């Protein structure tokens, strides 16, 4: 009985706590408040504070009751706890001026701190106090001031306290004040940068060098680091603000400032002070805030070393940089600025340094082809643990109604050994295995994915973690499908807690957990509830709330996680003016009948499964999961026990600086890192021994392992102190060939797309330094199209009907399905003004491409390819014409070339509603059409296999293009549109089409593209229609062409082509051969020495021979510079026999720089020039930093490679180049890329005045030594003068100035239509022709009433000359037919007004004469007294002033007439006397003698026409890079009875755009040259 009673009692003792636990309900207290969103806890206390509206409230009982604080008089903007004095100090910032409130006793009392008054015209936008970790009295107050904006209402002037203030945020200043007496007094740390009138924002950012009580930095307690910056709002030419900066150190509270010498000539973008390091980030280009950045690291605030970065750092997030327990620097970075607003500011990559902080590398498994957002979480209390998530940026969109494609896979992984090894987050939950869509035992394909691990789980626990996420393979992530999971082993394994996402918090070191669903309806109950667990998440209990709230935060009231009291803050939208907050205080402190755990309730939990981490084994004592007690060690931190490991292993080591880990994890030498280090500077030997491993800094393992040295080759490694030492090379090896590449043309970064021989796409955002494979979901990429109007957009076509589009340079892609039609390989056509609008061409009824029913269909999309609509059947090429013209007749106009299935002809149709209701046939039969520079040109077949061209500048009015009737021009069978610029079209008209013997004439149009004149004859052309024609980029009117010098014999098939190179400096009006250099690159004279350029000149290989048509002679950013491969002699030699030549003055003078053919590339606007041998293996490049004066060789790789191409960004403004090469390896060849970075070889960035004024580094100067006029003006260009600085992102080519406009000379004119340039330089009419009918202009412009005859000359459109020769002076005006009346009215005068004026004048003269006669002559005796009157006579009647005036007139008249009469008489007498003498002396001579002088203008000989040319010019483009060949069969040609319409070259009044996308060449070709001739009359 006694035994039974004992068993019963024992059972009761065990059961009662369980019953109490099941019946336990936490104490919940509710408080209702307005607009309260953040609650703060004082550490190790029961005191909480929060901001409510504009006041501060406080609770001294863990949130159960609240009261308004006393002592704060102002409205408060925000409050915060002092991070170094979390137990008792908080700060509240005032809304008014420079005032703050501070408490040092947990909010019981508050002291007002007033900062020094600001200037009268500015006002504070808020202040923030930073405190010192070691001295409680040290303050740094940071304030922001902005100029006040004028307001009309005096009541709102902001002068009175409480009045609203309007700030001008474009004129703001930061100020920093320091105090060493607890805020009683402050002194300003004044910026050492002078703020000028252009500085919009002035930034001062100061911080104590000590950032924690455990700081390892060598600094004093009073050391303060300050960064001062001035930012200027830049004019339109720039893409970003200009920044100047100074980084300084002060130890005397700002009285003296010491600038860091290493950053004097750099732009410091930001800095971060960590426990062991100070990190400084410098901006590579002060004129581009998106430029790449460098990271500098110091551990003594004195010596900084530049860290090695595996990729470009462009958008750092300095505020997120931190240091882990090993002293490694964690550097989050955003590598892009997405076009998608929601993507901005999100971390896209995380780099981790070695323990020295000098070599960064990405998290290994994130450096793959999937690019996305990265999130890294390191719980500080779990040493060595890292949880990282990668969320792919690829966005996939599909046609409505179609199944979704597979997304790029995201992944979440965990490491418990500081990132040495990683595993997925395993879900070990057999009870819920059926609730998941995948097999949770297949960890690699079914694991927990958490895209953003929140900091809510940062409360210290013994390995107990919670998170939200979904279980799967990472291919699908829908935020609405998230669930809540829990782990008890530090994150290695997880189990399901809730089927919905929750906010959560832990207490009592993880023994109490509170979770609240984001959505109250998750349990089909509209009322909110929270759940709690007292057994570390094993079981959960629901607590119902009476109100529906949106949870804002749930938190433990003790930040160290030791307490068992929580705060739940939620809100409802109760009224329009704000929110109503419900604050719940939840108390679990009496759980388990208030029992405290005893020793046997605890167990040991080992971190990292008991393995050594950083040379130490860690363990934590934690409560057993089912123990019926709470730890109740409130305000005590969680204890972590450690035991040093005896032996060091490879896990305790990292690769030395000169080594990197290969695919197997072994540390191998890296040539680039060897160059950056100094290991080879210490030896003269070819090799040096270096240990590949180094012990991790701070590792605590006891016995180091033996590390054997590895011999590193120092052959070719530059020595310290040389510029070559600073060149950085990155090599990438591939087992395939790159067949296509193209850069995105932006300054944001150096992004490019590459396609390999397997049809796989690769993307790089750092100029090829790091390359990622694009996941096309198994589809081969068969075509890539870049949007020519939107530089960040490109489209990739998949082999299975997908289209992958990017609008952010390849950072993210959207996938859509193309219409269910056969891909025909036709390019997309884009709308120039709508990024998401384009036309795709697919084949319909095309089971076979040869099927008779197979035809093309144009599909239109307005949403970037998400949906397509069928626009037009049988369309093979369309243009959004309305978006191309400057003044379109209709902005929605679309033109399409249509080829009907049943017809062999093609027609041109247009529509203004995408062919829904409107369809207009423009031409019934065409060969093809193209758009260029604001024109659309249509090729129309004519009789006898000829072509005619029609041009429009508005899409409605078409005019026939009239070609000149030169004697050597037969049929118009083929022509190539070369380019259009400055209102003219350049066109090549083929005159000989025999394959291999092609050539023709170079023509130029008037402003509306309808009247052409011949510029040069026998210009070289190839069979594909490409022409040796190139306009020099960035300069006005300079063109290079190759002519066939023996064209007559070539046409007769007697000789092969002999090419010569010619150049023009006035847009084709005059041509000369290239002047050869006197000596070659070795200082020797050229064998060809004739003074005649016709016999000895420089010749260059041109456009028709290029492997890549993007490799132009010149660069638009390197003004005046050109490279070319050629020779000096009578004719052009084969390519292999040529040398490489260079010019800096636009082609006036040349120099040989290499004896063999080389490839070239421009960088930094010509500030860095690079050459690499062509068609021969090499391991070196040549580069120049002084505009080609001197050249240096640099070895960029260990073994020789055959360089296929060298390239850089399209604007040639970068300092980074990309080489594509192929090298022979064992077992075959490998394709390689080399990224060569020259950023560090320059001492500094050139100092540039953003207003375009001259500075110490930039001066205005003419392009060449000559200063004569070109295009009617003298121009100077802003050019760099110092070779030791780099230019950067300055549009230098846009800064030029015209010194003056010159008088017009012969060089400012070209021949008009039907005129040609004769040998004497004059323009003469073509024999047998008449000038164009000038009256035709009246037909084209009905409003005209007059026209003028042509003089034979027309002024070059680019010329701005004034005065001087007027060779284009018009004739007298002629009346337009039918406008004779208007013409007569314009130039004739009406008889009525003329008669009135004439009679009026006669009447006035008659009256005056009668008055003088009556008062002065008749009254004084009449004409009879004329002979008696003498000057001064007193006999005249003078009764008043009128009489005296009249008498004076009479006397003066008499005097004048008397003298004239005497003079005539005397002259008559003398002449008679002389004649008499002559007759007497020469009486035998008969008849007169005559001479005549005809005065006329004359012109210089042709050789003198170019004398004195100034090479200054401005902004021309290269010609187009894509040919469109249009062929016509015999059946295509209809018989046309109409003859040519009459024509005039007078331009229309319509303005025409003068811009043309560079790099395009269009060819309209009629290959049939055997048809009979049809002479045009």
From Swiss-Prot:
Residues in the Lumenal compartment per record: 22-1391
Pfam name, any one: Sortilin-Vps10
Membrane topology: Single-pass type I membrane protein
GO biological process: Golgi to endosome transport; Golgi to vacuole transport; protein targeting to vacuole
Cell compartments where the protein resides: Golgi apparatus, trans-Golgi network membrane; Prevacuolar compartment membrane
SMART domains hit by this protein: VPS10
Membrane-crossing residue ranges in chain numbering: 1392-1412
Glycosylation site residues: 121, 168, 445, 791, 1008, 1301
Residues annotated as signal peptide: 1-21
GO cellular component: cytosol; Golgi apparatus; membrane
Keywords annotated in UniProt: Glycoprotein, Golgi apparatus, Membrane, Protein transport, Receptor, Repeat, Signal, Transmembrane, Transmembrane helix, Transport
Residues exposed to the Cytoplasmic side: 1413-1577
Annotated stretches, region: Disordered: 1531-1577
Keyword Nucleus carried by entry: no
Keyword Zinc-finger: no
Start-end of each BNR repeat: 58-68, 101-111, 179-187, 414-423, 485-495, 531-541, 762-771, 859-869, 1141-1150, 1183-1192
Family, similarity comment: Belongs to the VPS10-related sortilin family.
Role: Functions as a sorting receptor in the Golgi compartment required for the intracellular sorting and delivery of soluble vacuolar proteins, like carboxypeptidase Y (CPY) and proteinase A. Executes multiple rounds of sorting by cycling between the late Golgi and a prevacuolar endosome-like compartment. Binds the Golgi-modified P2 form of CPY, and this interaction is dependent on the presence of an intact CPY vacuolar protein sorting signal.
Xref: PANTHER family: SORTILIN RELATED, SORTILIN-RELATED RECEPTOR
Protein name per Swiss-Prot or TrEMBL: Vacuolar protein sorting/targeting protein PEP1
